[in-house]
Amino acid sequence: MCIRDRSNSDALTGGYDAETDEAYYERYILRLQTPPTSGNQYHYRLWALEVTGVGGVQIYPLGHGDNTVDVVLIDVDGHPADGELVERVQTHIDPGSKGLGEGEAPIGAYCYVSGAEAVELTLSMTVQTLPDAEQEAVTAAVKAVVADYLKSIAFTQNYVSYARINAAILEADGVQDVSGLTVNGATANVAIRERQAAVLGEVSIRYGAGA
């Protein structure tokens, strides 16, 4: 008997898209530029990136004391890794943080995996729309361009640029102009510390008619 089709009435959740060619190439270049060997920092970074869904890694040697390594994760969207992703990476490198050499890490090396701490950004602004632009679509476009910017700087920059957010909004579909932008109630850059990643929170937009 040949099964031609199969359906599932329940929605599937918790999965990640297959690794893109671009992500694979970046991981390949990383391996060439930062050779992993004998459980060094680059090795832990490589092991974490081998797990589907991981988008970025920070490594902190001796984070929990002697013979320990802290591995901090973001996902492929630049968001702090959730518990399921953290657990898969933990199991891959050092199951249960026991240092028994049952994962990729060598015997006696205790690895502690966690997701980054979220730094939520609340945005408020006035937007002038282009003629015939629909507010709902413009709101979605604004959120998308800001999210893309935050993803691009996750784990690579220690601040969120107020000017870059303003510029990104101006490039959003349907936006003619933006004014009065505040980020977390201010008109300044937002500092991002180690083990942190910026995430987009509430976005409040006041609309005015375009010229």
Please annotate each region the language model reported:
Residues T20, Y112-D132, L170-V190:
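A broadly tuned preference for mixed-charge, low-complexity surface segments
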Residues L12, T34, S38, Y60, ...:
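A generic structural micro-environment signature
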Residues M1-I3:
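Short, small-residue-biased leader/transition segments that mark boundaries at the very start
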Residues P36-N158, G210-A211:
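Carbohydrate-recognition loop of C-type lectin domains
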Residues D10-N40, V142-I165:
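Periplasmic/extracytosolic POTRA-like scaffold domains at the N-termini of outer-membrane
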Residues S9-A11, G83, V190:
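Short linear motifs in intrinsically disordered/low-complexity regions
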Residues A137-A211:
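An aromatic-glycine-centered, glycine-rich loop/turn in mixed alpha/beta architecture
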